[in-house]
Amino acid sequence: MQPAQSARSIARVALAIDPTPESLSAARYVRTLLRPGMQLRIVCAIDNPRLVLPDIPRIDALLTSAREEMTHDAQATIERTVALFAGSDVAIEHAIVDTSITGGSVADALANDTSQWGADVLVVGANPHHGLLRLVEGAMSDTLATRAHCALLLVPASYARESDGPLQRLMFAVDGSEPSLHAVEVGLGFAAPQTLLYAAYVVDRAVRLTDIVPVRALENAYRAEGEDALARVAPMLHATGNPTRRGIVETRPTSDDVAHALMRDAVHWHAELLVVGTHGRRGIAAWLIGSVARRVAHLAEVPVLLVRGQGR
């Protein structure tokens, strides 16, 4: 059986790291995704010490010392990370990006480096409290999601795959829109021949005071739209030759939303990667409006691949 094919194959993976355990977990996860022929760029961006130290006279020596220490720590972090990929049969390169030279924030530096290298996906380890999650907070998320010009893969700090090797369960959130279908194309680049592919559409059943259309009528309309969305994605999944399944997921009638329902289903199904397009319609779009990566990072219990719409 031939490997699953994708209109947008994954060939170049950028991994953003820092000294935190979250980055180490993300690196271990990436190791299981790589296949021979892929290229990996490990990037450690360091802050400009002038931004975190008071601007007082005669501080140049202190700034130089701080910068040297940051560079030393970054190099040690890169060496530990590179060691994880020994024997992986992929081309590996690494770089330290110094924002005191490039200017801008760490997110700016990562976005620029990732774009210049031509990455297909940028991987970031995420923790709700510290580490690189700050990159997906507020305006930072806009920088990575728009300027990097590639998919963004967030790996929760608490997530650990039960086994190494190719993905066994790959889940797609679909809504029938072109960005949603494009996300499926990109996500299929991580599928191996044995990967089970699951496309899910979420029907929002949550009652809101602003609803003026009868709830049952809305549910029926959303369900019909869901069936259509799943029918549109079916040929793409079947063309891979992989085992596939499709399903409609429903939110709870009250105190629930699409994001939580989707993540619950991903966890229940034991998804090893959830793929989401960032410019879809209705429920999915509502989830991803605003601080895209921040919202996902705080909810995610499984790795999430955020895929920008074509031409965005």
Task: Pin down the residues of each PLM region.
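Short beta-strand elements of ligand-binding domains
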Residues: 124-126, 151-158, 304-308
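General small-molecule cofactor/ligand-binding pocket signal
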Residues: 41-43, 93-98, 153, 198, ...
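Ordered, small/hydrophobic-rich secondary-structure cores
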Residues: 35-116, 120
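Small/aliphatic-rich secondary-structure junction motif
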Residues: 2-65, 90, 166-216, 220-223, ...
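Structural beta-alpha unit
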Residues: 1-8, 82-122, 238-274, 311-312
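Glycine-rich, Arg-bearing micro-motifs that act as flexible, cationic patches
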Residues: 10, 105-106, 121-143, 161, ...
